[in-house]
């Protein structure tokens, strides 16, 4: 129990006293039409890989993205980004039966994704917040354009 308490105390100290400038890696939550976990890692000062694991309609989707970041509105803390990638997922088909047909149908989905967003990294705490739009096109399973991929993310950055 003492080790657990010490671990929590050290984590809080790192959280409150670190200076969150540019970051290498961010891990956090993503919420929107689908909710999940986001992990972003920079491979250069302006490019990053992001992995999103999200759930929707009793299923799960894994998305991998390559993103280009740039300074937004002449401030160091606010960045815009765009990118592309792909996804694979497994859905249970639990949606509107009027649109989908048989609501008991399960499906595997495979497709491509784009992303366009803004994110802000706080100076005082290692937290990053972002908003993005991530349209997708499924080639396999529920084929077609999915333009409802907007989300809000909060990440711990280090």
What is the predicted function of each stretch?
Residues 35-37, 59, 72-74, 90-96, ...:
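Gram-negative outer-membrane beta-barrel proteins
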Residues 19-24, 46, 71-79, 122-127:
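Short loop/turn motifs that connect adjacent beta-strands in outer-membrane beta-barrel proteins
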Residues 29, 37-41, 64-68, 84-86, ...:
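Residues on the lipid-exposed face of transmembrane beta-strands in outer-membrane beta-barrel proteins
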Residues 47-51, 90-108:
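Flexible, solvent-exposed loop segments that connect beta-strands
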Residues 21-33, 41-57, 84-88, 131-139:
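Transmembrane beta-strand segments that form the barrel wall of outer-membrane beta-barrel proteins
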Residues 64-65, 93-100, 141-148:
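Outer-membrane beta-barrel translocator domains and adjoining extracellular loop/strand segments
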Residues 7-15:
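Bacterial N-terminal signal peptides
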Residues 23, 33-35, 58-62, 78, ...:
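Residues that define the transmembrane beta-barrel architecture of outer-membrane proteins
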């Amino acid at each position: 129990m003492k080790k657990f308490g010490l671990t929590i105390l050290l984590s809080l100290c790192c959280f409150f006293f670190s200076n969150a400038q540019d970051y290498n890696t961010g891990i956090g939550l993503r919420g929107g039409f689908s909710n999940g976990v986001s992990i972003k890692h920079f491979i250069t000062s302006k490019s990053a890989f992001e992995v999103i694991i999200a759930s929707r309609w009793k299923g799960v989707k894994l998305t991998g993205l390559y993103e280009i970041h740039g300074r937004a509105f002449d401030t160091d803390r606010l960045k815009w980004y765009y990118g592309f990638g792909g996804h694979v997922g497994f859905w249970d088909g639990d949606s509107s039966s009027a649109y989908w047909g048989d609501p008991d149908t399960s499906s595997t989905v495979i497709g491509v994704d784009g992303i366009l967003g803004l994110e802000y990294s706080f100076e005082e705490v290692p937290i990053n917040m972002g908003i993005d739009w991530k349209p997708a096109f499924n080639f396999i399973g529920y084929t077609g354009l999915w333009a409802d991929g907007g989300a809000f993310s909060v990440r711990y950055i280090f």
